[in-house]
From Swiss-Prot:
PROSITE patterns: CYTB_CTER, CYTB_NTER. It comes from Cynomys gunnisoni. Heme b b562 binds at H83, H182. The lineage of its organism: Eukaryota, Metazoa, Chordata, Craniata, Vertebrata. Pfam families: Cytochrom_B_C, Cytochrome_B. GO terms for molecular function: metal ion binding; ubiquinol-cytochrome-c reductase activity. This is Cytochrome b. The keyword Hydrolase does not apply. InterPro entries: Cyt_b/b6_C, Cyt_b/b6_C_sf, Cyt_b/b6_N, Cytb/b6-like_sf, Cytochrome_b, Cytochrome_b_C_euk/bac, Cytochrome_b_N_euk/bac, Di-haem_cyt_TM.
Length: 379
C-alpha cells in the first residue's frame, strides 16, 4: 500500500517540500538560515497577533497601550520583547542568508534570487512600520524623516508624502494605516516565501562547491530536519538570552519618551538593521541623490546575476574574490557603525568613503577580480 504522505493531495506537497526533498549531501550550516527565517516569521506573526489584541492605533493611547501590555497583560512584557528582539534576529538571519547567497553564487537561480530581494524590501517596509507603532519619540521622528524622503521625487513628491501621511504631518491617520499595513504585510511575506520556495524547488538547492549535485542527493528528512532543529534551538537560545537578560540592548532609549511633535531628539536614527542604508543616504548631500543611493544600495542585489563573470559559481575556490567579499562585509559593518553616529567630522568623511567603497566593490572590484581569476585558471 502506498504511503499516505505520497498520495494525499495536500500532504504530498509538504512531503515533496520538506520530507522526501532531494538535497545536496554537502550543504553546510550556512544553509540553515532558510528554515530559521521561517521560524522567525512564525514567531513574529504569533507574537504580533497577541500584541494586536491589546494595542490601540490611536495617537492618544498607542504609547499607553504598549505600557499596558508590558505592565498588566499576563506575560505581555515577554510577548512584546520577543516581538521587538525577534525582528532583530530576523534581520541577522536575513543578512547571513543573503551573504551566503552572494558567497556561494546562489544568485544564479535568477527567479529565486529576485523573489528574495523583493522579500527583503517587504520585510524592511514591515519592520519600519512596526517601529512607528509604539509612538515614542524615535517612532514619530523616524516616521517623519523616512516618509519625507519621498518628497524628493520630482513633481509628485509633496503630494505623495501628504497622501501617505493622510494629512499635513505624521498623525493619527498615519499611525492607523501603518498598523493596518504592519498587520497584513507578514501574511504577504508568507505568500512570497511560498513562491520563493516554489522556484527553489524547481532547480534544487545550491551547495558550497557550486557544482551540480544531482548525482549525489540525500533525502531532506531525517538528515537536514535534525540539522535544522539544532539551528532552531540555537536561535531560540540566542533570542531568549536577549529577551530575558537585556531586552533593550538593541532599542533606542528615546522611544521610552512619548512622541512629541514639538521636540526633536538630538540624533534621529532607525533601528540597527537599517543603519547601513541610513549611512549611505546621509553620505550624499543632495536629497534626491541620497534617496536614489538608499534604494539602489538594496536594489543592487538584483545586478549580481548580471555581474557574475567568473567561470566558477561559488567563491569556495576563489581566494581573491573571497578577499573582496570580506572587504564588502567589513565595509557594511563600517556603514552600520557610521549610521549610528552624529553628522560631524570625521564621521561624514568615513561614511562617504564607505559608501563609495560599497558600490565600487560590487560594481567594479568583484567583476575585475573574477576576470583576473579566470585568467589565472589558464596558467
Amino acid at each position: 500500500m502506498t504511503n499516505t504522505r505520497k498520495t494525499h493531495p495536500l500532504i504530498k506537497i509538504i512531503n515533496h517540500s520538506f520530507i522526501d526533498l532531494p538535497a545536496p549531501s554537502n550543504i553546510s550550516a550556512w544553509w540553515n538560515f532558510g528554515s530559521l527565517l521561517g521560524l522567525c516569521l512564525a514567531i513574529q506573526i504569533l507574537t504580533g497577533l497577541f500584541l494586536a489584541m491589546h494595542y490601540t492605533s490611536d495617537t492618544m493611547t498607542a504609547f499607553s497601550s504598549v505600557t499596558h501590555i508590558c505592565r498588566d497583560v499576563n506575560y505581555g512584557w515577554l510577548i512584546r520583547y520577543m516581538h521587538a528582539n525577534g525582528a532583530s534576529m530576523f534581520f541577522i538571519c536575513l543578512f547571513l542568508h543573503v551573504g551566503r547567497g552572494l558567497y556561494y553564487g546562489s544568485y544564479t537561480y535568477f527567479e529565486t534570487w529576485n523573489i528574495g530581494v523583493i522579500l527583503l524590501f517587504v520585510v524592511m517596509a514591515t519592520a519600519f512600520m512596526g517601529y512607528v507603532l509604539p509612538w515614542g519619540q524615535m517612532s514619530f521622528w523616524g516616521a517623519t524623516v523616512i516618509t519625507n524622503l519621498l518628497s524628493a521625487i520630482p513633481y509628485i513628491g509633496t503630494t505623495l508624502v501628504e497622501w501617505i501621511w493622510g494629512g499635513f504631518s505624521v498623525d493619527k491617520a498615519t499611525l492607523t494605516r501603518f498598523f493596518a499595513f504592519h498587520f497584513v504585510l507578514p501574511f504577504i511575506i508568507a505568500a512570497l516565501v511560498m513562491v520563493h520556495l516554489l522556484f527553489l524547488h524547481e532547480t534544487g538547492s545550491n551547495n558550497p562547491s557550486g557544482l551540480i549535485s544531482d548525482s549525489d542527493k540525500i533525502p531532506f528528512h531525517p538528515y537536514y530536519t535534525i540539522k535544522d532543529i539544532l539551528g532552531v534551538l540555537l536561535l531560540i537560545l540566542a533570542l531568549m538570552i536577549l529577551v530575558l537578560f537585556s531586552p533593550d540592548l538593541l532599542g533606542d532609549p528615546d522611544n521610552y519618551t512619548p512622541a512629541n511633535p514639538l521636540s526633536t531628539p538630538p540624533h534621529i536614527k532607525p533601528e540597527w538593521y537599517f543603519l547601513f542604508a541610513y549611512a549611505i543616504l546621509r553620505s550624499i548631500p543632495n536629497k534626491l541623490g541620497g534617496v536614489l543611493a538608499l534604494v539602489f544600495s538594496i536594489l543592487i542585489l538584483t545586478l549580481f546575476p548580471l555581474l557574475h563573470v567568473s567561470k566558477q559559481r561559488s567563491m569556495m575556490f576563489r581566494p581573491l574574490s573571497q578577499c573582496m567579499f570580506w572587504f564588502l562585509v567589513a565595509d557594511l559593518l563600517t556603514l552600520t557603525w557610521i549610521g549610528g553616529q552624529p553628522v560631524e567630522y570625521p564621521f561624514i568623511t568615513i561614511g562617504q568613503l564607505a559608501s563609495i567603497l560599497y558600490f565600487t566593490i560590487i560594481l567594479l572590484m568583484l567583476p575585475i577580480v573574477s576576470l583576473f581569476e579566470n585568467k589565472l585558471l589558464k596558467w
